[in-house]
Amino acid sequence: MIGRRKQVALALTGLLAAAAACQNQVRHESAGTGRPAPSAARAFTLVASGDVLPHSSVIERAGYDADGNGYDFRPMLFGVEPVVSRADLALCHMETVYGADGDYSGYPVFKSPPQIAQGLAATGYDGCSTASDHALDDGAAGIRRTLDAMDRAGLRHAGTARTQDEARSVTMLQAGGARVAHLSYAFGTNDIPLPTGQPWAVDLIDRDRMIADARAARQAGADVVVVSVHWGTEWQDAPDRLQLTLAQQLTASKTNGRPDIDLILGTHAHVPQAYEKVNGTWVIYGLGDQIAGEMYNDKGVQDSRGNDSTLGRFTFAPPVRPGARWQVTKAEYIPQMYDLDSGRVRDLNQAISDGAELEGVRDRIREVVLSRGAADDGLVMGE
């Protein structure tokens, strides 16, 4: 596998149901470098990015970049590789499932080439959330192919499952001196019913279940609990009522005075949305689309905002005393866009010298990201 792996990943099974958390045996599975987890607590950086949504034009671009030998998504992501690969832990959102044997498609029923998992891993990503409204575009077979390909690439995943045991597991990753649990949920599956006999195939938004899962992950040894949520109103810059209400409820949940959830990462709206500190916990309502083809908004008009996004970067410091939470000591956002002409993700901080147009995109993203007062809580634009 190409790319720098930055941590040992641990899978902890049988622990998502809070009532059963103490009864199940913890199972450790290593991936990546095979190095043992660090024993001393030390600070770490976490980077997160938005929806990977390969439309037909994106698939065609990856085919072109492979020079006739399959599909290569690495050049597409090369512009953000420096930021992603330097993080101790990097998480993406894989919105689509994978096809096979050339059966690939874009909107409205997505089936992406499995080589995208290799491209994400090569860029430095350690895992992806997979619960989305397109998670059942090809039924249970699509989920199986997707997670199989991620496993082969060394890319961890959370939010969908091939088996009931997998659905009951917690995705646990090592970052610095911390064990980080990654949970993932979606608002729905575009009215596609869950596979017969597999109600656990996709994790769906349910406040009580999400809190129970977070508590179970903590009981299993998670120092930091990160929750990815596929939610929001498409093409709306502002978070909607569900986002605001759920963010309040999730961040207010505590056990023995310690918050159950340490970071919330939002996707789905297609446009960047605000960052906000809610009850002392950072919430990104919407990261935007990291990779997408031409996007048409709810009025049927091509909308360039659908190719804008941010990378969120958070520095976590060890607790000041046993039993306390890991604290975010630095919160940053990095503006980026998917350039339709070149088929490349561009870090706008690095590309800003290319002209006023890109500067305008960066400024538009900044205005939305800071629209709920995040600057007052210390959020800054990162390099």
What are these regions (language model features)?
Residues 2, 22-383:
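Acidic, metal/ion-coordinating pockets
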